Amino acid sequence: MNKLVARQRLVMTFTFFSMFFGAGNLIFPPFVGAQAGSATIPAAIGFIVSAVGLPILGVLAVTFAGGFDKLASRVSPKFALFLGVAIMLTIGPCFAIPRTATTSFEMMVAPFVPSSYGWLAQLIYSLVFFTLAFLFAQHPEKLSKVLGRFMGPLLLVLIAVLFIACLIHGIGIPANPMGDYSTNQIARGFLDGYQTMDLLAALYFGIVISANIRAQQVDDESQVQKETAYAGLGTGVLLIVIYGALSYVGVVSGAIATIDPTKDTGATVLTNLTSSLFGTFGTAFLGIVFVIACLNVCTGLIGTCATYFHTRFRTVAGRTLSYRTWQVIFTVFSFIVSNAGLSAIIKVSVPVLSALYPIAIVLVLLTLTHKSLGARFPRVYFWTVLLVGIASFATCISSLVAVFGGSIGWLDAALAMLPLQQYQLGWVIPAILGVAIGIADAPRR
């Protein structure tokens, strides 16, 4: 078979879509809409570029390169290992796994518990949640085969119901842009798109799409790339429609109830809306859907991270660590992190993602232009990633210190000298400079 038929392409599109859309993706677009208010359109455009466009380009890049390791090894094999570990820790126990517990807690339990008992309720909930996740992770196929069939459609139905209810309710008077969205809405939306972590996931899991296409007897590599592009285009259209609808939902919610951008999250926006439109039943139903979906995602991530580290680090400090041991480590660590709360996890994850995302972006762009650039000037990978890495990690350190109420004067002053740094895009000029140095470095090799 040289190409897929329409039905197979549709299946690939929904497979692609299911990789990138989960319960966690539901909370960010509404928060963008609630904060941006009357300026939601430019904010949503920025969000869609980074939350939809970049992940799809990432999958294409991994397909063209033949896998994540081959792509990242163009910088160096050690860098490929470092970036792989950083990505797995980010989409695993440091941020994404704990976020599944905190998100579902905020949706299911927090609205019904007095704030004075919130910390105790979260402790008990996260203990039960991660115990179940660990048990399900021993036999993930039993959970995924059942939940995977209906959770995606159920989430889509839920979004449709919320959107239609908002259309019937009417938008009212949109709130004025607030917080970080008071100015530069496109740039802020672009940066908040990092929170989905889908580009990082695309770099590591993107090869799965091309493998599924090859399993349909498509053996010509150029056709595999075309079919991947078709699936990516279809997925992009779906995500744009969904994120646009959810942003509108956020605008309506923001007009109904005022939020505090420094304390509230997208979960707060959704619970405010469902409580207003559907009462207690609506809030409880939304919470149940989130718990089931988040539990399914958490189970898969625990297994994925354990498999990755068991494969690459069979011994640590002279001791052999089994697959089950890695599962225990990641489950316990995620339980501890989750009790910091959703807002705290998001605040800390933003600086970390600001370090990883620019590196991922330039890797993707260099891979997509490999034939005309990287193949002729191999050193562009090294120099571009090096300079972007310096700029983005400096930004990460500065932002992390600021999260905890401190500052590093000389570092902040140095970063302020970078063009576009006011938009958190200070890595762009170093990237261009890295390409130029990489091209100039080629004759000396």
Where are these regions (language model features)?
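Hydrophobic, membrane-embedded alpha-helices of multi-pass small-molecule transporters
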Residues: V11-F21, A165-G172, Y181-L246, F285-C298, ...
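Helix-loop-helix connectors at the membrane interface of multi-pass transporters/channels
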Residues: V32, T102-A121, R214-A215, C298-V328
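Selective recognition of specific alpha-helical transmembrane segments in multi-pass small-molecule
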Residues: G53, L57, L154-C166, T228-A255, ...
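Membrane-water interface regions at transmembrane-helix termini and the short interhelical loops
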Residues: T63-L71, F129-M151, A215-V218, F335-K347, ...
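Hydrophobic alpha-helical segments and their helix-loop junctions in multi-pass secondary transporters
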Residues: P93, I97, L156-Y181, L199-L200, ...
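Membrane-interface loop-to-helix entry segments
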Residues: F136-C166, S349-I361, V380-I390
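Hydrophobic, small-residue-rich membrane helices and short re-entrant helix-turn-helix hairpins
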Residues: H139-F150, I186-G189, I209-L238, I256-T271, ...
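A generic transmembrane alpha-helix motif of multi-pass inner-membrane proteins
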Residues: H169, M178, G189, P378-R445
